[in-house]
Amino acid sequence: MASKPLQYVVVERKITFGKHAGKIMKIAQPSGRGRIPFRRFCDEVARSTSFTRQEVEAVINYATEIAKDFVSNGDMVDFGDLGTLVPSFKSRAVGQEEKFNPNIHIEKPMVHLRPSKSYFTLTGVHFKQVPKKTKKSNQPS
């Protein structure tokens, strides 16, 4: 695939921590990001293989279902270059005198991805500053 620059805008933000806490400073913020639909992604994968788009979709969807089943049983799943899928949940704090009840105090069980640093670190990219988009007003002129 052709390499496009990562677009960004420069915005002013009040820094809330660190040596610049309380100061208004300029930072770069990613911009111009598009979302690639799953079907288009599968079309691109299919073009490089002997599989059809439907077969690629089916394999990816089935792999995620199987991985979710393993994680639901408390296992960690090595998901290749993407990283590791691990079980996670949120827990409410309970006082020392109160009995911990998992049905009440544990909530939102989920699959968490621990991304592979080598895969998710972008190398060889270049950047292009773009003008900040202005919000359109609905007031007549």
Segments (PLM) and residue ranges:
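Strongly charged
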Residues: 1-58, 65-141
